[in-house]
């Protein structure tokens, strides 16, 4: 047991030392290149790099990444491991829906996160149903809400 721990520590120290050595070698290489380059060479290199990037290229990339990341974030910061709308859920602590989303079950502990439950879907609380009326574990029509056709 002690031998395994010692080997593990030795491996970790070796990995950390090798990472530090590569960092130091790249830093010295960069310093040498900077010393050898003149100001005009540096300004020309910067101009060439900026010419290669178009104005529309950066905002689209950043915009896409931000939209993708915000879709994966939970609605409530206290809920770290929750599912967003349309993702798999099971009505358990491990696979729960974020915020006000509800898990609509399709089978035994197999469902999808939705805004609210439709009529005749399995429910526990009235707040889970779109009609706000849960009776005998099913969402029911709300007699007080009238739908007026156009």
From Swiss-Prot:
Keywords: Disulfide bond, Glycoprotein, Knottin, Secreted, Signal
Signal peptide stretch: 1-18
Localization annotation: Secreted
Glycosylation sites (chain numbering): 20, 36, 52, 110
GO cellular component labels: extracellular region
Chief subcellular location: secreted
The UniProt record lists the keyword Secreted: yes
Residue pairs linked by disulfide bridges in the UniProt entry: 116-130, 123-134, 129-139
Pfam families xrefs: UPF0506
Domain of life: Eukaryota
Domain notes per entry: The presence of a 'disulfide through disulfide knot' structurally defines this protein as a knottin.
Recorded family membership: Belongs to the UPF0506 family.
The protein's name in its UniProt record: UPF0506 protein SJCHGC03144
